[in-house]
């Protein structure tokens, strides 16, 4: 789901990049240029409750009926009991949490639009309780 064209910030991994301090790493200068700018795209998760829908990746993401991206991966999430997909949602004015949650989403699966639920937190154990048990 992450390619050389995606930043850790867009992929939701900004917490894993040590930007404070002077620790050198490959790509630091490029990340410093975009670190404080609004994100134009963001990796998010979706679930589709229609059991007949099969997510494979490359399905179009619709927000309020407008195409805003596509899934980079999809499949059935056995631990969550639902169809799961991840993809980048794009918007020229930025993709803040408020903008993301204000929309209604659907995925184009085999030519038909299926309602989708946006997931900004991990689908399985979102509070990390199992890992701390």
Predicted regions and their residues:
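Conserved, structured C-terminal
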Residues: 1-133
């Amino acid at each position: 789901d992450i390619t050389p064209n995606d930043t850790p910030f867009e992929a939701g991994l900004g917490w894993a990049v040590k930007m404070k301090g002077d620790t050198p790493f490959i790509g630091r200068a490029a990340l410093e240029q975009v670190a404080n700018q609004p994100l134009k795209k963001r990796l998010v998760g979706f679930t589709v409750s229609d059991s007949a829908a099969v997510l494979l990746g490359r399905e179009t993401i619709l927000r309020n009926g407008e195409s805003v991206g596509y899934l980079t991966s999809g499949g059935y999430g056995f631990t969550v009991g639902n169809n799961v997909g991840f993809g980048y949602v794009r918007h020229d004015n930025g993709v803040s949490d408020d903008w993301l949650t204000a929309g209604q989403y659907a995925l184009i699966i085999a030519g038909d639009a299926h309602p989708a639920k946006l997931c900004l937190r991990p689908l399985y154990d979102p509070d990390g309780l199992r890992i701390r048990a």
